[in-house]
């Protein structure tokens, strides 16, 4: 088990210890469930009552919250960011693979960097390049001509089709499929003609892709996911999409083809973005927002209808269907009221 003193954490987080700086911390926990040897955090004032009752050995607090706290604290600028840093330091997540399992199938042309680990029944295709300390989980398939940067981790049962490049320090979760064909077809007299998807996928450094998400390859050029992007579970990224640096996309969101999303965007869960659109840097879409036009300015956008009692929803639905009729009636009334007698 890893452990660290509060003094060491204060140096890591540029914080100030309030209490015993020799106290040893071995893990993180919530205020409600923390016990001795654990550090917790207060990032939301609605949990203030739990602060007074917590059994944590120490708590990450802002300077304001630390003023009235009598227990041991590490005072930092942002307690939630501090929590994330400490959680990384004390992380006990097992590796996706250790060593090279004898059942792994590795093409002789593949190049493996120092410290590469490959799990049981994984398949490594022709001309694949794996950087140093790459971890390939059991049952994962890496198609030909793929490149994976150092320290990247693929969990069990990930599939990379051919010509997919992953940067350094990426995490790809189980069930993710990267490089499958985009939805490209031409219609000739009612019959669909498949367009070969000859592009690839290019993913930058420090990208995380959630379980069962799908990233389609480009039709001609590449689908691009830039540095620092985080993608939740069950997200669909279509052919030739471009996602800018440090953008976050929550679960069950769907991007149609040739969408360009800027840097530092936050896309809420269950959003749908139509094809061939551009979304500016710094756009925030709340959950279940449907985007059908370009977004040129940063800001918060929403379109979903909030939940309500069924009887109220039914009434509003009927009224919505009557809006055009109501508009025409109002327009007629306004016209008649402006007519001189």
Curated annotation (Swiss-Prot):
EC number, UniProt record: 2.3.1.191
Keyword Transcription regulation in annotation: no
Pfam families: Hexapep, Hexapep_2, LpxD
Active-site residues (renumbered): 239 (proton acceptor)
GO biological process: lipid A biosynthetic process
Listed InterPro entries: Hexapep (IPR001451), LpxD (IPR007691), Trimer_LpxA-like_sf (IPR011004), UDP_GlcNAc_AcTrfase_non-rep (IPR020573)
Key words of the record: Acyltransferase, Lipid A biosynthesis, Lipid biosynthesis, Lipid metabolism, Repeat, Transferase
Pathway(s) annotated for this protein in UniProt: Bacterial outer membrane biogenesis; LPS lipid A biosynthesis
Keyword Transmembrane appears in the UniProt entry: no
Protein purpose: Catalyzes the N-acylation of UDP-3-O-acylglucosamine using 3-hydroxyacyl-ACP as the acyl donor. Is involved in the biosynthesis of lipid A, a phosphorylated glycolipid that anchors the lipopolysaccharide to the outer membrane of the cell.
SUBUNIT field: Homotrimer.
Name used for this protein in its record: UDP-3-O-acylglucosamine N-acyltransferase
Biological source species: Shewanella sp. (strain MR-4)
Lineage: Bacteria, Pseudomonadati, Pseudomonadota, Gammaproteobacteria, Alteromonadales
């Amino acid at each position: 088990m890893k452990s660290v003193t509060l003094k060491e954490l204060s140096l890591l987080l540029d914080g100030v210890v309030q209490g015993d700086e020799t106290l040893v911390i071995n893990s993180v926990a919530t205020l409600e469930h923390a016990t001795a040897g654990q550090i917790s955090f207060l990032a939301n004032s609605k949990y203030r009552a739990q602060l007074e009752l917590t059994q944590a050995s120490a708590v990450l607090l802002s300077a304001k919250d630390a003023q009235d706290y009598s227990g041991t604290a590490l005072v930092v600028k942002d307690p939630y960011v501090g929590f994330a840093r400490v959680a990384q330091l004390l992380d006990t997540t097992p590796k996706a693979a250790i060593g090279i399992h004898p059942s792994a199938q590795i093409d002789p042309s593949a190049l493996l960097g120092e410290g590469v680990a490959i799990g049981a029944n994984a398949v490594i295709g022709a001309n694949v390049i794996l950087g140093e300390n790459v971890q390939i989980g059991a049952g994962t398939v890496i198609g030909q001509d793929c490149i994976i940067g150092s320290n990247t981790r693929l969990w069990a049962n990930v599939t990379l089709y051919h010509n997919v490049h992953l940067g350094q320090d990426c995490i790809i979760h189980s069930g993710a499929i990267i490089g499958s064909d985009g939805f490209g077809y031409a219609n000739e007299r009612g019959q669909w003609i498949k367009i070969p998807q000859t592009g690839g996928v290019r993913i930058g450094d420090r990208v995380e892709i959630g379980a069962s998400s799908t990233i389609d390859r480009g039709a001609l050029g590449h689908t691009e996911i830039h540095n620092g992007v985080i993608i939740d579970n069950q997200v669909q990224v279509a052919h030739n999409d471009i996602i800018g640096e440090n953008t976050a996309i929550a679960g069950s969101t769907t991007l149609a083809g040739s969408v360009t999303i800027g840097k530092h965007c936050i896309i809420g869960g269950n959003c749908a973005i139509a094809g061939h659109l551009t979304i500016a840097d710094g756009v925030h879409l709340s959950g279940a927002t449907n985007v059908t036009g370009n977004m040129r300015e940063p800001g918060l956008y929403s379109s979903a209808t909030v939940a309500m009692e069924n009887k109220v929803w039914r009434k509003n639905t009927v009224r919505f269907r009557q809006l055009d009729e109501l508009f025409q009636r109002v327009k007629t009334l306004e016209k008649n009221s402006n007519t001189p007698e």
